[in-house]
Amino acid sequence: MKQPMSLKINPPTTPLFIARMFFPLIAIALLSVQIHAQTSYKFDFGVSTNAAVAGYTKVTPANKYTTAYANDNTNGTFGFEDWDSTAWGAFSRGAASDNLNRDFIYTRSHNGFSSFYFSVRVPEGKYTVTFYIGDPGDTSTTNIKAESRRFLVENLRLAKGQLATRTFTVIRREPAIAGGGTVGLDYSYGREDPSICLNWDHKLTFEFSGARPCIGGLDIVPVDSGITFHMCGNSTLVEQEDEPWSCWGAFVHRFFNSSIIVNDLASSGLTSSSFLSQRRLAKICSVMKPGDYLFFEFGHNDSKGSVSQSQFEANMKTYYDSATSHQATMVFVTPTARSGDSDSSTSIGNYAQYTRDYAKTLSGAKLVDLNAAVIHMKTALGAAAYGGNGKAIYCYASASNQWPDLPAGASDDTHFCDFGGYELAKWVSHTGLKAAGIDLRKYLLDTTAFDPDKPDLKSAWIFPYSIDTVFRHASPGGTVFKDTVSAVSDVASGGSIPSLLRSISVNHGSFTILYSGYLTGKAEISVFSMSGKTMARKVMVLEKNSRAIAWKELNGLPAGVYFIRMQVNNSALGKSAFFKL
């Protein structure tokens, strides 16, 4: 195994290395770099022939955040997440020693998959991050996200030679709670599994995407100041790990400057009670400070019978008491409306109204009526002037190969797409908070009010999705990593139950697909390019007691990134897997 490159920082130190274990199947040897723990982390992106700007650490495409050293917990380990290094690289406009933008990392492709990811192992805490953006010799268009798709920079278009900086403050958190205990993470489907989920994987990760993102460097500085929005909620507020779903909590950062920090501990399936039992509020209370805001948005799961009105109101009081005891402001948010809701007073089994009514009884509590705003918004979007699609904010995806885990598409009348999450966050940030008596306008990047009766045009909204949530790590040379997988229902014939897709290996063009459980019946295996083009297809009959499929006819595929989907008796066998040749 190759030893990773080390970078000497004064005082010298013996390099130790850490890995993110996306999938514990295979340890891979890639170049990795570790730097001595320090107060700030400053990186100069570019080519190896240019020396680093004084005070910065040079980073080139050779510096990969490897999974080969999973047992190390050394802060300062850094590198690029290597999902497809053919799509991005380094470029130099000169060797000036005092200009971070004279060389940079950028994407070569313009096909919608123009992304690269950079990760740094840092201690838990708040960090102000400054990005150095642009190309001295060409145009650039850059989007930036942090962790699990927290949106920071939106389509920053810079003219030839134009350079810019953007600064935000983000949180890196751990499940452990100061004083004892841990947050009860959701490991189902890998949602909050620290080996997969960017929000919980012990490092800060930034995603750069767009038509031509150009990043010359970045500063990461630990801070203890700022106003934090602590988010308590369910899947309508969570920072969704996987496309094409999204929620408003992931977009709030986009509209505020670095004085506002979002700490979103919402998680799918939670009620106002289970959020407490998973010690998520306890985690928030361990870091909440005077001047912070505690947001509460529940009701969707409470209304399904597990939490009565009286218990819901008692829970509201618990959250309120926690906020006031920390000299923070309590903000109750009515639960988002479903696409079929038209009456805000009865929406979500009356829990929107319960939230309104009980919030009025608590002194100093604020109310953001998001439920009513969503109903206005979807009504407006249904008008011809806005495209005539009232469901435009919800997660609908047509049957295609764009989403390999959704071969039949998606029709979700509860959860939101990226556009929906963006629109809701824009309304909360620009209008909802002010209407609730919370004046944070001086922290907004744009103070223009947002009217839910006059939403943005979805057709004019450009937003690249996060490729890392569609395709997980793949190593050079053909090794395959599986995505998180889940069992599906009984197949149509024979009653066999497809269990978990275990792994796929590639050796000189021959695929071996391993799966647990015993399957019988018709199997269909398809290989697609990242643009969705079918590259190969195999239909075969599975023999009883079989646990593996060999496929030797793929050695003609050109080098590139592909995904493979397996179906048995027309039922998808877990999620798709991705590989690189």
Name every feature range the model reports, one short phrase each:
Residues 44, 228-233, 237-238, 261-266, ...:
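Structural recognition of the beta-strand scaffold that forms the well-ordered cores
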Residues 38-41, 385-486:
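Conserved catalytic region of serine esterases and O-acyltransferases that act on ester linkages
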Residues 492-496, 537-542, 550-555, 559-581:
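C-terminal tail/sorting-segment detector
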Residues 337-376:
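Substrate-gating cap/lid alpha-helix
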